Every structure is written in structure tokens, then in C-alpha cells.
Amino acid sequence: MTSGQEHYWQGEWIDEAEAERRLDQLDDFARDALARPLSALTVLSACDRLATALTDPANPFTGRLTKRMREDGFAGGEVTHTLREVAAALGREALETKLMRELGAIDPGRLARFDLRREVYEAWLPLGLLVHVAPGNAPAVGALSVIEGLLGGNVNVVKTSGSRRFTHDLLAELARHDQTGRIAERIVVLGFPSSRTAWLEQLCAAADGVAAWGGEEAIAGIAALVRTGCRLVDWGPKLSFAYLTADAWSSPQVLQGIAADVCRLDQQACSSPQVVYLDTHEENEVLAFAERLAAILAESVAASQPAQPSLLESAEITNTVLVTRLEEHLGLTRVHAADDGSWHVLADLRSALRASPLHRSVWVKPLPRERIGEVLRPMRHYLQTVGMGASRTDTAVLATAVLAAGAQRVTVPGQMLSSYNGEPHDGVYALQRYCRRVDAQLDGRFATDACLDDLVGARDLLPPPVQITPKAEFERLQGDVSRAEVFFRSGGSSGAPKLSAFTWDDYHEHMRWGAEGVLAAGFDPCGDRAMNLFFGGQLYGGFLSFFSVLEQLRAVQLPMAAQDDHAMVARAIVEHEVDTLFGMPNYLLRVFTEGEKELRRDGRVRKIFYGGEHFPQRQQVWLRREFGVEVIRSAAYGSVDAGPLGYQCSHSPARAHHLFSGLQTLEILDMEEDRPAAAGETGRLVFTAHTRRGQRLDRYEIGDLGRWMEGDCPCGRRTPRFELLGRFGDIFRSGSHFLNYRRFVSVAEEALDHHGAVQVLLDEDAGSERLTLRLEGDAGEQDAEVAKIFLDRYPQLSDAVVRDGLLRFDVEHARHDSFERTEASGKLLAVVDRRERNL
């Protein structure tokens, strides 16, 4: 910002004349910005980066902001406190909690079903243009209100006092931390005095909502400017007090807590105590307490750096103290004051609630508990915080009484100005006042659509500017799991099993996305009768996850889990009239094989939703032909470490998936370099989970290969589509050649009509390598002839075995239970490498 450029407008610093010109077109600016939706996830990322900068004293921006605040007249202690409070409020955890508490979701703008059994969609959408008339005595309030407006997706114009630039600088820096540019186009900061009514009138005329702070007269003046239909969010004057019973008012700790609350922010906060009430009828107890409090307050003020009141504020303090001293002659009051006027304790034997002149001036009054309602209820519209000093039993009784009389918050002495993430403000949730709840009630054409946004386009969520983390280095992402509450272990099919960390919010959110994916795949929560046959136990998440997915869908579920007695499971399917199965392909095939007679005769199973491994096409054909199964689709594409990643719709080919674009960002990168793979080419899948709380998952290389699919899907969704093309582990080096497990599977299916398990075993002896291909079937079944078929149909294998003589190749047939599987999930291990260098 250069000299004369005093205002911040959508990413630019402008002067008075330009601001005047743009104000005439404010509605046009707002309309253009609102046409490009802003996800709360984008705001979260930018705020978290800014919070990190504010906690670093060496950060250049933090240094500039500190200097600016001191130049604006803020005391050193207040500067430090303000920056600390702002950093805490902008942290990812604080804002995530706020969104969940106030709007019920971390991305509340999704127009999604609240009940997955009905075609009814709801979302929290922005009011539109939100004007914030910020107070001059609290530097952070305006900026934090704008951030709440951004979380709701609004275009925000904040009016600050004419001289101070804290809000300008902080919000401009926030916009700089956003890679998309969407935040900048939703922020305007104008610094001008309240006497400039023409600008304020223009702002209010264009506004869809106005948030205002100030006294009654100021709020009334703004209300007169607000047009019909515009929402006025009134953060008007509030009054807070402490209330002490006899067993608390003699405690030095309680008095020290009250003194600390009086001194914090020079008593400028709405939650600062202006009165201390005592639960007594005795005048002497009031006067004695005031004397003790004065001594403690004097010590607290001496240890702080109090700001000096303005000329008008000093005049109000002087007038109040003078009148109170005069009333001493009537036996009504007693004044205790510092010689330099830095603090005042004003004892008053009348119970009526009244505001103090602030700047460490506090009333002490009697208020017997039986009179709480009588005295406080007439002032109910002004009451905010009560610092309750009482026994455990009395606290419960008295808290109920003051809340019934109109108070909004009850805390303890010393904590009156403290808060917690997601706390209501003045009895309401701010985010709900900055948003509007909308709904769409549709029909059966949308039976498989969980979110209407997917029919419009994908969320524009960019990956963070960090290095890629390979799957083998997953533990690097677990440097901070302090928020983790739930742990699951991977099945181990792609390496050593490892624990993944989640919060409960992560878990429930992932299950919601999983349920949306199953709905898109064709599951009918109102009509289908499902049996969950995934593996469970040993920290494995398969069974438990799909139990919760079906719970989210509120579907009929029989949670059988995978059992060793496949025939028993088949009988249970028939007995309980199950028509839909969830499980892993190899396990489900064993159930159909061993329960073939019952299942074929019953013919009730119509849908299969699978996960964990590939379902060969030949085996799908067998199930459709022999058992009448109509739908066989992936229940979800995901992993224990990364969560849900993609889903299939009714038009998806076998390996094709839509991206969960509101949850993940996918990059498909070149096989050798960290750059995007060429169009249509196979690349490495790298995911960023934007809402993960238990551990961050930024640019994580999952270990799978795939390619982007071009064109729009016939299902109508506009979310990105990709095709899975195997795993890194499917490609292995043997006999100096790179071979692919998927090629062995393809040859088995196409040339041998094989629809059982396929496994590659690698070992070595006497310096030579051996590759054994294990096929499910009767032992010794034409192994040599089958080996020749593979050599004929797989040229790279033939080169290694026949031409170069570097590899021995054998085929063996084995029973189903001879195949090596992961201990936790029972998933088939595609490649088992026993070579010495891999042990």
C-alpha cells in the first residue's frame, strides 16, 4: 500500500476517489464474485497458513502488523494478546470446530441430502453482500467477523475507523495466502469515520446483511439505513458481572480472578465484569469486600500496562466517581481509587444493575439470590456473561437462575473473557446469522444423487505447495496425531501394516461420503436388504466402515462379517431373504461356490458391492449367468490410510471411478517425474485430503496407478473421472525385466477362462530367480501346458525366461486356502516376494 491508497478492494489498494467510484458499482462487484462459489475448505486452508505466520515472531508480516498496532496506539500487552487471540481463532482446529458446531458440516455449502433415503437437499448458502460496521475499540472484531462471513461464502465489506489499518493489513494478508484468488474478490475494507454517512448509506443500500457493533444510538442509526428485507445482525451493547457467594468472596484466588478479568483488554470486552454482585443482605459485607477487592486490583493494575482512556472516556470516569463520592454522604456508596486514577472500586448498597465507566472501574453491589430475577430480568436484553464464584451445588442453582433472568454465559472468575471453539455469541451462532438455509425437494430422477453440486461441477480445491509423500514414507505424515481418536490398521496388501489416525469427525464424515458413493452405485436404502460380509477385527476397518455406511443410509443391514464357514453364510443369506451383499470379491466367490445349490435355487441376490481388490470380469459374468446377479459394482475406491477416494455410478466401466471432489484433490503424475502425466497416459495417483483432522494427508502418493478419463459421464455428474490401472506393487522387476501382475490375470481370464485367485511368488536359489504363478484349482492340473500359454501370450515374460534365460517360470494349481493373504483383512496378496533382498 502506497501513500494515499487507504482502502483495500478485492485484492487492490485504492485511493479515496477510486473507492468513491467503485461504491457506485458495489452491487455489480458483489454479483460477479458470488457467481464463483467459495468453499469453506478454501477459507480454512488460507486461515491456517495465516495463523501459522502470526505465531512466528520472526515472520515479516507479524513484525509489520505489530509495529502498525503500536503506531495506532495499542499498548504492548494488548498487541501481544490480540495477535495471540487472532492466531488461535484462525487455526484449522478452531475453525473446523466452529463450522461443525454452528453449521453442522465442514463444507456446509454442499446442496446435499440430509436423509439419504429422500430426494430432499439442503445447504447453508451466503446471504450475499455482508457489510460489517466494526467497532473502533476492539481491533480484531471486524477482521474475525469478515472471516465468519467468508466461511459462509459471502462477499464482505467492512467499515473500520478512519485511522487504524489492522483490519486492512490482516485481511489483505489472508487473501495472499489463498492460491485460488476467491478470498480476495470477497473482501473490501474501507476506513472512514462514522460522520461520513454518505458512504455508510451506500453500503447499507446494497447489503443483504449488515453486522453492526456499538451503543444503542449507533445501532439505531444503522438500522435506519437498512432496507426492507436486509438482515440486521445486531451485536449491540452488553453488560457482564461477577456473582459471588459467601464461601467464594473471601477466597484470594477468586478476588485475583476478578481483578484479572477487570484488567484484561482494559475492560473493553462485552464479557468484562462491570459489576461484582454479592449474595448478601448485609451492607457491611459489601463494604468490606470492596476494600479487599481494591487492594487486589491495585496489585493487578501495577503489574499490567494499562492503556490511557480518551478525553471523553476520562470525563465519564471523573463524572461517575464524583457523583459516587457525593452519595457517600447519604450512606449509599464508598469509593476506592488509585491516586493516578488507573482503577476504581465503587461500592454501592443499591442492587440495581448499572454500567461502569470502564478502564478498570468496577461496581460492588448486594444481590441476594432470591432477588436475582426481580433485579436482572428488566435488563435481560443487555446481559451477557456471569462469572460465578460459588460452591459446586450453589453454582448449579445460581447458574440456572441467572440464565433464566437473561444472561447468555456463565463462567468462573478469572475466565470471563475466555472462550471455546464453537461457542455461541450473545446467545446465537454467528455463522447461522451470516447464512441462509435453503432446500430443494425433487423426485425419483435424482434417486442416486446425494449432492446436486456434483451435477454442476467439481469443487476447486488446490493441493498445498508441499512435497509429495510416497506411500513407503506414510509415517512422515504422522508427526502430529494429537487430535487422533480412532485408529485403523491397513490390511498390509501393499506393504507392512500400519496404523492410520482419525478423529471421530473424520470417521463419521468418511462414512457419509462412503454412503453417498454407494447410493450413486445403485444401492437402494429404501428397498434393498443388505448383508455385510467384510472382514472385521484386529484394527481392520472394512466391516466396521460398511456397518457405518449402511447406518448412514438407514438401510436394512445384517452385519454377519466374513466367517470361515462359507456354506453357513450362504444359508443365512437365503434364510434372511438377503438380496444385496457387501464384501471382498474372493470371499464372496467362496460363498457362492460353497453355497452354490442354495443360492442358485433361491435366486434372490441381485446386487453385489465389493471393495478391497479387483473383481475379475469373468467371475462377474459367472455370477450374472449362474445366479442372476444384476448389479456388481465397487462399493467404494479408498484405502485405510487415505479414506474414501472415489465411487462408481451406474455408467462406470469396471475400473472407472468418479472422484470425491468435495473431500479429495487428485493429481495424476508422471511415472518418473513430479509433473502431470500426459493426457490419457498412466500415472501415479497423488491425493490431498482437505478435511482430515486426525493427521494431515497432503499430496500423498497412494501407491495406485491410473489415468484421467476424458469427456462427461452419461450419468450427468461433472466430477472428475479416472481409471485405475493397478498398483505400483503390481509392477515388479524379475529376470532384469519389469513384469505386471495384471498381465498374468488378463491372460488367465482370456486364454484359460479362469475365474479363481491368481498369485505371483518370487524367490531365488543358487543365484537364479524363480517366478511361480499360482492359480486356484486342482493341484498338478496341466501345469506345463498352462505355463506355455503364458509364455506365448506375454512377450516380456518370454524374453526373460526363453530368450535371456534369466528367470525360471513355473505354474502351480492350488486350493483356495493355500493362497497367502493379509492377516487382518484376508485380502489376497497379488505378489509375494521372498527374494533375499526383500526379506
Give a label for each model feature.
Residues 1-130, 436-489, 495-521, 525-527, ...:
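Nucleotide 5′-phosphate-binding alpha/beta core
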Residues 110-263:
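Rossmann-like NAD(P) dinucleotide-binding subdomain of oxidoreductase/dehydrogenase enzymes
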Residues 131, 528-533, 686, 774:
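Short, well-ordered beta-strand segments
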Residues 335-349, 478-497, 510, 515-519, ...:
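Short, compositionally biased "basic patch" segments
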